[in-house]
């Protein structure tokens, strides 16, 4: 077996290669559970918004980052760097707004409607991919639990907003699945698309490249290793050409006060929120707990000997998020695509007594519904 394929696990006997479609009953359970969790979150948001006389549609489809993506679909990208007050739309990667523009051109309704529908559709493909990875490694029960846990993340509402997280998670999940099933070129092409979707697309490319370089004697693996980063590099290079400077994309990031600082800003925020702030903002506490829990889960994933592609993807994603010196509050959302971090929980829940499993999942689902509404209607900044 090549180094790109997952070794057999003690939880299920090795079987002949199969496609996800051959496990439709388990997949149907996972997707129904996913839709149920997200529908409950949407219901709680709607009821909360009704009590506040607040519309739900703008929250989901047209505010914050969604507004920028719609602006790119309508008017294209900026031609100049601008000042240091943020607002330059070159910071946003192009695949999602290009899809919005293309699909809206051949379908009825507004581009905002198209963008939201694309995000919801992508979330279903992402949930399918999350289930496929869990099922491949540990069986259908873990696959279903992993899907539910991903749906029930505190910032899970973003999966059904006009943002790129669902599209990116779908591409990342299926790229990882392709690596686990020894299809390096498929994984590489998906990594190219992921690299055109979000800055953290480089984490998907890293997972593909590192895994494939370990199979350097195989021409397909070497080709995949070279191909995987090209999407990310292409957009970053295009921004440099557009602005006429070699550091174009990173200069744009600096206008948003977002650049790598080795984690100093993260540590400062931790210290401020956990030690000095007597009345910290509740949403920032959630972000802090999410970051700390994610680091602990990565260590647990490594101890559990998770397959290398998953460890590289989540490790690079976590490294980027923790060492960024930019805005602090969206970092829980930035980690939303890093679903393999939830695998240790899913595996242990699968072994737990049903009563304990039900209690934990119910708490997670209800908590996600509450936090989604709080994030959208009480927290005054972007998710």
Report the location of each language-model feature:
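Membrane-lumen/periplasm interface segments of specific transmembrane helices
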Residues: 37-52, 56, 61, 205-210, ...
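Transmembrane-helix motifs of polytopic, lipid-linked glycan transferases
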Residues: 117-137, 295-299
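Short hydrophobic/aromatic helix or loop-helix immediately within or flanking a transmembrane segment
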Residues: 63-78, 85-108, 263-267
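Membrane-interface alpha helices of multi-pass inner-membrane proteins
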Residues: 151, 172-177, 185-213, 227-231, ...
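Loop-to-helix entry region of an early transmembrane alpha helix in multi-pass inner-membrane enzymes
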Residues: 87, 94, 98, 106-125, ...
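Short acidic/glycine- and proline-prone juxtamembrane loop motifs at membrane-interface regions
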Residues: 160-167, 331-332
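Transmembrane-helix signature of polytopic, membrane-embedded enzymes
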Residues: 110-114, 130-152, 312
């Amino acid at each position: 077996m090549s180094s790109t394929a997952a070794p057999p696990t003690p939880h299920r006997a090795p079987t002949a290669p199969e496609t996800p479609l051959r496990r439709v009953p388990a997949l149907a359970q996972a997707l129904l559970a996913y839709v149920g969790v997200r529908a409950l979150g949407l219901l709680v948001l709607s009821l909360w918004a009704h009590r506040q006389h607040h519309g739900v549609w703008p929250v989901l489809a047209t505010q914050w980052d969604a507004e920028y993506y719609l602006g790119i679909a309508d008017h294209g990208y900026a031609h100049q760097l601008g000042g240091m007050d943020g607002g330059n739309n070159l910071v946003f990667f192009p695949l999602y707004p290009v899809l919005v523009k293309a699909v809206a051109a051949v379908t009825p309704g507004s581009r905002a409607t198209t963008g939201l529908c694309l995000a919801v559709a992508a979330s279903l493909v992402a949930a399918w991919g999350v289930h496929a990875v869990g099922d491949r490694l540990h069986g259908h029960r873990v696959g279903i639990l992993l899907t539910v846990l991903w749906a029930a993340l505190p910032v899970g509402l973003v999966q059904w907003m006009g943002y790129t997280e669902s599209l990116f998670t779908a591409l990342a999940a299926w790229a990882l699945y392709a690596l686990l099933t020894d299809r390096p070129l498929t994984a590489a092409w998906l990594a190219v698309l992921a690299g055109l979707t979000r800055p953290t697309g480089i984490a998907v490319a890293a997972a593909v490249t590192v895994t494939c370089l370990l199979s350097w004697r195989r021409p397909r693996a070497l080709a995949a290793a070279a191909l995987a980063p090209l999407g990310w590099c292409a957009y970053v290079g295009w921004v440099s050409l557009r602005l006429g400077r070699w550091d174009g994309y990173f200069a744009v990031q600096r206008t948003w006060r977002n650049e790598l600082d080795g984690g100093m800003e993260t540590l400062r925020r931790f210290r401020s929120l956990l030690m000095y702030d007597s009345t910290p903002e509740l949403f920032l506490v959630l972000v802090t707990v999410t970051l700390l829990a994610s680091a602990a889960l990565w260590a647990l994933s490594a101890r559990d000997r998770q397959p290398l592609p998953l460890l590289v993807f989540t490790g690079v994603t976590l490294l980027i998020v923790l060492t960024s010196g930019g805005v602090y509050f969206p970092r829980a959302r930035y980690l939303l695509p890093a679903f393999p971090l939830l695998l240790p929980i899913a595996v242990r829940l699968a072994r737990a007594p049903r009563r304990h499993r039900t209690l934990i999942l119910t708490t997670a689902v209800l908590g996600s519904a509450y936090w989604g509404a709080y994030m959208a209607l009480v927290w005054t900044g972007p998710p």
